[in-house]
Curated annotation (Swiss-Prot):
Residues 324-337 have a biased composition (Basic and acidic residues). GO terms for biological process: bacterial-type flagellum-dependent cell motility; cell adhesion. Pfam families: FliD_C (PF07195), FliD_N (PF02465). Keywords: Bacterial flagellum, Coiled coil, Periplasm. Residues 264-277, 344-358 have a biased composition (Polar residues). This is Flagellar hook-associated protein 2. InterPro entries: FliD, FliD_C, FliD_N. Belongs to the FliD family. The keyword Coiled coil applies. Homopentamer.
Length: 722
């Protein structure tokens, strides 16, 4: 009995036997699980093909839909530092000239230095920006707390900041964030008291400087020094009445009205112009009427040129009188004008020489004068800043207005008479300040509110903002700085947008073709040819390689894609048929020797140079090649992009071919997974049964072993007694 043994049964040996038996039982289950993985790979492959097909459909549909790139426009600026242009697809193709003279800006006023412990008293502080009012109820406190309170209330309209003007000095800067003349910054209530206290503003004075007359003879020039430098930021305007007169009359008036330094003009005939002194002590001469006694009247028309407004005087039908001419002496034989007493030390100085004898003869013979004069402003550095030349005729005075802010800081006016037959005379010269809001002007303006001013196709235009959307339909013009000369802006078709859209179409097409090639073939070289794949994408594509090998649906789709991209289509009004190869797109766009296996797989190539030239020369034909209306019903019904869209539509969507195929695979996956679950339950039950049987067998063997041992012990004891 002790020799009775069952192979594989004993101390744990039955486990190996059970596993061996269960391994054979698991074969059907493992086969079903392997099918699930195959189905999952196939389903992922179908979904990838569907995704790339949808990307291609979206790309080609965009080539003929209402937002197709062939209607896109791009705007060009010849000086992007000075101005930039943005155009929408609604803008028309056009070209314009532009010269920026002023940039719209807002007021920015700087205060005098204030101490570190400066406190702002309590009160209602009202800041006005145009018609907008910003009220701050202040209980009093340190100026930095006041800054925070103003900025919180001002938001995007008013900014108050602290400026360190030096290491130990600080000042307040009041800045308006709104631009344009209509958005001037002013102060009311307690804000006005604070502005006056800190010398942010002061009471305005209308005329900064006045002068009766300045006259220069033929071939000579004169200089008029201002009592103090005129700052560009002060918003000043120089005005005068210019006229061309006979040489003898002008020479006498030049002598009579030349002012002495620091005083009023003197006259050899006792005609002294009255003078008033401003607060700075500089002489301010009140304008007088012209020599013939006729007052300067409002102009009937004007011309604006390079920042200067030239205004015509009112027309007069009467012949000029000779009253008062007898007081002017005749020109001497040498043509030299007698110098008025004190002229060499006066504010207005005359230089140069020229003969006027012939000129007087010309005047007597023709009875009329016509000519031009050169004007210039002198900068603080001594540079001459030319003004547009004056073109005048005799007895036709013109009023001229020059905004000084366009010329920077200046200190003098220079007059050069290039006319050889008459004298150039400026009367009623004055420098005035612009209308000040509330009767106050800034003391230290960092900038002053002004409109943007520019010449657009020769027409003077102003706007209160630098972003102009209402000048050209569909175009936004953004001004950045002044231009030194006339620049150009243009709106043209956006060829790059068209080309990029076509390149995107080709890329999406090739990606779909590559995916079909990968899943329907088991050649790893297909993946190796795709250099644009990332390592992760290559790993994924390797898993899907050949997963749908020989799939007739995908092979048919591939064939139809190739045929649609190689077919000819009628494109354009000329009725000519064109293919993608005509614009540089084909399976062999670049000439090469030998056979390229990649070209045999149906991938498209692009000759960018040919495509670019086609878009430039035949944009409408290229557009029609991708999609056009062939029957006049205003609906696109032909073209490469249209036919590809129609081809792909049945494959996509919830009820499309890919969705149906994918749903079928999902059902197989579910049914197979259920079979796997059933196998797992059966195998678990089978393993329990085997373990129960072998445990029972093992118990029986152990019982028999014990009985055998008992018998042996009994026999041994019997033998021992004998």
């Amino acid at each position: 009995m002790s020799d009775v043994r069952i192979p594989g049964v004993g101390a744990g040996k039955y486990d190996n036997l059970i596993q061996s038996l269960m391994k054979k039982e698991r074969i059907p289950r493992d086969n079903a699980a392997a099918k699930v993985k195959v189905y999952e790979v196939q389903n992922n492959a179908l979904k990838d093909v569907e995704r790339y097909a949808r990307d291609l459909r979206d790309a080609v549909k965009g080539l003929y839909s209402f937002n197709n790139p062939f209607a896109e426009k791009e705007a060009h600026s010849s000086n992007e530092r000075a101005f930039t242009v943005d155009a929408t697809r609604d803008a028309a193709e056009q070209n314009h000239t532009l010269r920026v003279k002023d940039i719209a800006q807002g007021d920015a006023f700087l205060s005098d230095p204030l101490p570190e412990d400066f406190r702002v008293p309590s009160g209602t502080y009202t800041f006005c920006i145009g018609e907008k009012k910003i009220c701050v109820s202040w209980k009093g406190g340190h100026y930095r707390d006041f800054i925070r309170a103003v900025n919180k209330q001002g938001k995007d309209s008013l900014t108050l900041s602290e400026i360190k003007t030096s290491g130990a000095s600080r000042a307040l800067l009041f800045r308006s964030e709104l631009t344009g003349k209509s958005s001037r910054l002013s102060f009311e209530d307690a804000a006005l008291d604070l502005a006056l206290r800190l010398r942010v503003v002061q009471e305005a004075r209308s005329d900064v400087f006045t002068q009766d007359v300045l006259s220069v003879g033929p071939g000579k020039h004169a200089r008029l020094d201002f009592p103090h430098p005129l700052r560009a930021q002060a918003g000043l305007t120089l005005e005068f009445v210019a006229s061309l007169e006979g040489a003898s009359i002008a020479n006498e008036e030049s002598r009579a009205h030349t002012p002495a330094q620091g005083g009023a003009p003197t006259s050899s005939h006792g005609n002294t112009a009255s003078a008033a002194h401003n607060q700075d002590g500089a002489a301010a001469v009140r304008p007088t009427e012209p020599a013939n006694g006729a007052p300067v009247q409002e102009e009937t028309s004007s011309v604006f040129f390079e920042g200067v407004t030239v205004k015509n005087e009112a027309s007069q039908g009467d012949l000029p009188t000779t009253d008062g001419l007898e007081k002017y002496p005749a020109v001497d034989d040498k043509g030299d004008n007698p110098r008025a007493p004190g002229e060499s030390q006066g504010t207005a100085t005359h230089e140069g020489s020229g003969s006027s004898t012939d000129n007087a003869d010309d005047t007597r013979s023709t009875g009329a004068l016509a000519g031009s004069g050169k004007l210039a402003l002198e900068s603080l550095q001594g540079h001459a800043l030319p003004l547009p030349p004056l073109v005048l005729t005799q007895n036709a005075p013109q009023m001229v207005s020059i905004p000084l802010r366009e010329y920077g800081d200046v200190r003098a006016l220079i007059l050069d008479n290039a006319q050889a037959r008459g004298a150039l005379t400026l009367r009623a010269i004055r420098v005035r300040a612009e209308d000040a809001p509330g009767g106050y002007v800034p003391v230290n303006p960092a900038s002053q509110a002004q409109d943007a001013a520019f010449d657009f196709d020769g027409v003077h235009v102003t706007r209160g903002t630098n972003s102009i959307t209402d000048l050209i339909p569909g175009v936004t013009l953004s001004l950045h700085e002044r231009t030194e000369k006339t620049e150009t802006l243009s709106v043209t078709p956006d060829v790059n947008a068209m080309k990029n859209a076509i390149i995107e179409f080709v890329a999406k097409y090739n990606r779909l073709m590559a995916e079909i090639n990968i899943v329907t073939s088991n050649k790893s070289a297909i993946i190796d040819e795709l250099a644009y794949l990332t390592p992760e994408e290559k790993k994924k594509e390797t898993e899907q390689l050949g997963s749908l090998h020989g799939d007739s649906t995908l092979l048919m789709l591939k064939d139809r894609l190739r045929r649609n991209t190689s077919n000819a289509y009628r494109a354009g009004d000329d009725g000519a048929s064109r293919t993608l190869a005509h614009i540089g797109i084909s399976t062999k766009a670049h000439a090469s020797s030998g056979i390229n296996t990649a070209q045999l797989r149906g991938y498209l190539e692009i000759d960018e140079e040919k495509l670019h030239s086609s878009l430039n020369a035949q944009k409408d034909q290229v557009r029609a090649l991708f999609g056009h209306d062939s029957d006049g019903d205003l609906l696109v019904d032909n073209g490469v992009a249209f036919t590809l869209t129609e081809l792909l539509n049945p494959y996509l969507g919830r009820s499309g071919i890919f969705a149906i195929r994918s749903n079928g695979v999902d059902e197989r996956i579910k049914s197979t997974e259920k079979r796997v679950e059933t196998y797992d339950k059966q195998l678990e039950k089978k393993e329990r049964e085997l373990r129960h049987k072998y445990h029972t067998m093992d118990g029986a063997l152990r019982s028999l072993q014990k009985q055998s041992d008992a018998i042996q012990n009994f026999n041994q004891s019997v033998r021992n007694r004998n």
